[in-house]
């Protein structure tokens, strides 16, 4: 009779008759009738019963001590009952959304939805005074944010202030406009939107984009377009002087192919012409060394900060005969120069080494002076120099020390 009643009840209510979910059956002497049993099963909700997992008991303790005989249902909570208790009792959807799910199930009452459109709070505790309900409710806290994100996409107050989202945080990041493309010199490069070159250690922004190395309007634009300008120093083509050319002619005489040069022989004893030729070469070597030591006086960057190494260059400047009289104070004579070349800070010429009496004539043909005063950048500051538009290294280092003193006084 008991098996028949249990079978009929199980067929009618499959979801409620999971082993371990209900209290143990009463003794056989006090078994209710079939109608009473059905009534009791239907009136008791599933979450009415206690969850033994939160009382500190081992859910698998009784499975070892007692065999399951159909009567000790509560004493042997199986793994199946453990899963169903979590599903139906602790993860009730009404705990997360309050009355929201009830309105969804009742057919979307529009008036009720308009009155409570904000749906504040994702957790509405049950009015349940049963023992263990608080402990069961605490299990759903880690699931709150994930459920809220799925159901209500307009509420994001639960997000962390330092979350990975960069929206509405006041921070924007844009890709840098200018980049160094490969196979281009680092002192001058262009991009799709702007072009930057460097003068005296600072950036010089040009107004017109151009692929040439010649700038648009500054003192160095009067040079040839093949010169490398807009750098910390000007690099130009160097013409060989007469000493070096004569040395090359004596060292490598141009003789017809297959013929022997005059004065030279293949004997072991040197001829008189060989001794004379070697004497001439020694004399030329001495002259060449003297010319190099006297003319090449490199400038050094001494006061420029963050300079890796010292940039050495030689800029030989010829006296500008057409310079105004007020610029005479800027001229200094290089006393160690063999030809008495005068340095004028307002003129930049091609780099010519001392090459005899024809120096001034050739230099004047390729030289042009300018009196335009343009601003340039020094140590990140926009400086306007009145004396010269393209200062020499010594002047640049002097202005560097002056700007540093001014900044220290302001501080």
Swiss-Prot record:
Keywords from the UniProt entry: Cytoplasm, Meiosis, Nucleus
Main location: cytoplasm
Cellular component, GO annotation: cytosol; nucleus
Subcellular location: Cytoplasm; Nucleus
UniProt protein name: Meiotically up-regulated gene 147 protein
Protein purpose: Has a role in meiosis.
Record-level GO BP terms: meiotic cell cycle
Feature: compositional bias, Polar residues: 33-43
Region annotation Disordered: where it falls in the sequence: 1-52, 102-137, 156-191
Gene name for this UniProt entry: mug147
